[in-house]
């Protein structure tokens, strides 16, 4: 995996991610202009069907499993503590409780082992890992997850946000709709919606489509989808053909509509910046139907779509280690007294010194 590393030296970082319900710890090696994933361990907090994950419960999960996951990551990597150059952690954005739990743990390791700390922007971690794994050079980035929906492109050492959700994230829309149908959260509600959607498609239900330039909105479509779910449960829901629709039809219709919105705003950004590449990152980026729809659009423009598998698109520690080590190699450090976390941390706040 090729990287643009200014200082050609062997360096190792341990990354800690815990901004939502995934606790991830990974170890990465940068050597010359290449990088190697040494370990990538993850443990997920799964809440009961019909519910979401609360910050306090998720934070408790991260505290309970941090030591176990860290030991496994070090064991898988086959390294000594002395080999590690820095400890990287997710500074934000994310849920306050889980972020704080992992920040405290990372700070403890840094003090215990005498290592320097690097606070990392969660989205920048996704982007840099995606670029490295796929080889995408100068893509428009679609960042889609449970907490974020942004269309991004790089310019002048910043990841510039060209469009975003005006209310809730697309992943949050899907997760909350899953509760309306009591869909399991194991392994993830979005994945289970994707599986159900493949069984639907007899009818495409009419749902709100809200795009404003390169911005979009998902709260209205969620409300309408929840209303249709309630009608279906009461045996009152009928499609355009007058026949009752199923939960699979609802999942299909929701996916098709929200993904069409994402494709539209991404294509608009591609035209604006003159790019023929799309890189999809974030948990929702694992969805094969989203990748397929984006691929059709990109092909019409003579372009390409890049995406990673679940090891890297779902929240993980290795992306934090990677982005943190890139920053570390430019001289960036996070002093212990400033090693806080924040629920709001814009992608374009980060100075991307490692890129030209």
UniProtKB/Swiss-Prot annotation:
Keyword tRNA processing annotated: yes
InterPro entries per UniProt: ATPase_NBD, Gcp-like_dom, KAE1/TsaD, Kae1_archaea_euk
Complex and partners: Component of the EKC/KEOPS complex composed of at least BUD32, CGI121, GON7, KAE1 and PCC1; the whole complex dimerizes.
Gene Ontology biological process terms from the UniProt entry: positive regulation of transcription by RNA polymerase II; telomere maintenance via recombination; tRNA threonylcarbamoyladenosine modification
Annotated compartments: Cytoplasm; Nucleus
Protein name: tRNA N6-adenosine threonylcarbamoyltransferase
Enzyme category, top tier: transferase
Cofactor(s) demanded: a divalent metal cation
Highest taxon in the source lineage: Eukaryota
Molecular-function GO term, any one: metal ion binding
GO cellular component: chromatin; cytoplasm; EKC/KEOPS complex; nucleus
Glycoprotein listed as a keyword: no
């Amino acid at each position: 995996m090729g990287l643009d590393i200014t200082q050609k030296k062997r360096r190792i970082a341990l990354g800690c991610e815990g901004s939502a319900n995934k606790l991830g710890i990974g170890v990465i090696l940068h050597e010359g202009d290449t990088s190697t994933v040494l370990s990538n361990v993850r443990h997920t907090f799964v809440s009961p069907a019909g519910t979401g994950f609360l910050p306090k419960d998720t934070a408790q999960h991260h505290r309970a499993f941090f030591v176990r996951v860290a030991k496994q990551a070090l064991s898988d990597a086959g390294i000594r503590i002395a080999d590690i150059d820095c400890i990287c952690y997710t500074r934000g954005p994310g849920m306050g409780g889980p972020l704080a739990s992992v920040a405290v743990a990372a700070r403890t390791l840094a003090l215990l082992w005498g290592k320097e700390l690097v606070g990392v922007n969660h989205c920048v971690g996704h982007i840099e890992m995606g670029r490295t794994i796929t080889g995408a050079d100068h893509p428009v980035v679609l960042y889609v997850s449970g907490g974020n929906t942004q269309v991004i492109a790089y310019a002048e050492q910043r990841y510039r946000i060209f469009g975003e959700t005006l209310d809730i994230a697309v992943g949050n829309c899907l997760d909350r709709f899953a509760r309306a149908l009591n869909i399991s959260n194991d392994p993830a509600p979005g994945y289970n919606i994707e599986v159900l959607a493949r069984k639907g498609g007899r009818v495409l239900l009419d749902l709100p489509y809200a795009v404003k330039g390169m911005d979009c909105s998902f709260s209205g479509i969620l409300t309408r989808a929840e209303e249709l779910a309630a009608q279906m449960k009461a045996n009152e829901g009928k499609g355009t053909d007058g026949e009752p629709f199923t939960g699979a039809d609802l999942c299909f219709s929701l996916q098709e509509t929200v993904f069409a919105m994402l494709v539209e705003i991404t294509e608009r950004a591609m035209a604006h910046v003159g790019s023929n590449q799309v890189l999809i990152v974030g948990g929702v980026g694992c969805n094969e139907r989203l990748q397929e729809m984006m691929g059709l659009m990109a092909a019409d423009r003579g372009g390409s779509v890049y995406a990673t598998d679940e090891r890297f698109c779902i929240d993980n520690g290795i992306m934090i280690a990677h982005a943190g080590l890139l920053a570390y190699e430019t001289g960036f450090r996070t002093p212990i007294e400033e090693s806080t976390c924040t629920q709001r941390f814009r992608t374009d706040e980060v100075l991307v010194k490692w890129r030209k």
